[in-house]
Amino acid sequence: RKESSAASDVYKRQDMGYQMINNWAYAGSHNGWKFTDYDASSPLLATEINANIAIETNADFSTAGKSIQFAYGGNFKNTAGFKIENFYRTAGKDFWITRDSLAAPAINKPVNYGTQLHLMGPSNKFFNYGLQFNRGKGSEWYSALGYSTTYGAKASFSPRDNLNFTLMYEHGYEDDWLNWIDDNLLGIYQRKQRTTVVSMNWFGGDKHELRVKAQMVAFTARQPSAYLGDLKGALTPVDVALSPFSLSDLAFQVRYRYEVLPLAYLYVVYSKGGRIVELDEEDRLGKLYQRPWDNPQADSFTVKLRYRF
């Protein structure tokens, strides 16, 4: 059984699910139809149908996948709304995950399909909310090996006209999440991601503005198995030890703006955040969120005066 001798370097290089890609082309047709001819007795105000087809390739026009997507949504007269989306993506290849490896130029991906449901509550000045649920394999935009489930909720609370609080939480997990390690070495994990976004906005007349926002991400990858990609795009199990890991990400900012003169503004900004990766199995949400707060990569206080000519 082999073990990586440079585990920390390997885990710095992997994409953790956030990969910038080049060598990519996309073509598609996006079509929509809106219907508003509902009589007075109907609770519906308007509905909309969207039907999309697309093909994704690399720069050599080798097909990565073809997809179709169908969505149906509507708005009610009480300002509530809903949207249901379904997609199907053909089996194809991922040309980007192996970073131009000569040993494995691409990895084969299976048929993908799934459903998304979005619900929006009635809109009012005091309280607003929305719910979402996703279940499927991949999406119309990318391919995956295993099924994923994501659910989330967002609520906005305005106790006064000049004060607003917003809270969003999203929880997702995925079977057989494929992650690049090095060259043609890849790992398959059980992935879980939890995201919380909290914000507050306050306005004091025309001169004062205070904004506070925090975004926290806890990303965990467990039960790793190592695989080698080959020239045909197949994945073969290999006896290499991979460690589970936990990623914590924080972006926190407090920003105060004061209008000194017309077109002249004073900004006072405090920012803190960063990303920490540990090769462990910590799963407590509070502990994962706290890591970049205790050991931030950025911690700054800025005062700036801006004048617009």
Placement of each model-derived feature along the sequence:
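Single conserved hydrophobic/aromatic residue that forms the stacking wall/gate
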Residues: 1-11
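Membrane-embedded beta-strand positions of outer-membrane beta-barrel proteins
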Residues: 5, 31, 47-51, 82-86, ...
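Transmembrane beta-strands of outer-membrane beta-barrel pores
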Residues: 8-9, 33-37, 51-59, 86-92, ...
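Extracellular loop and loop/strand-boundary signature of outer-membrane beta-barrel proteins
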Residues: 15-19, 56-57, 100-105, 136-142, ...
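Residue-level signature of outer-membrane beta-barrel architecture
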Residues: 33-35, 55, 72-78, 120-121, ...
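Short loop/turn motifs that connect adjacent beta-strands in outer-membrane beta-barrel proteins
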Residues: 36-48, 75-84, 124-128, 162
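Outer-membrane beta-barrel "beta-signal"
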Residues: 252-270, 291-309
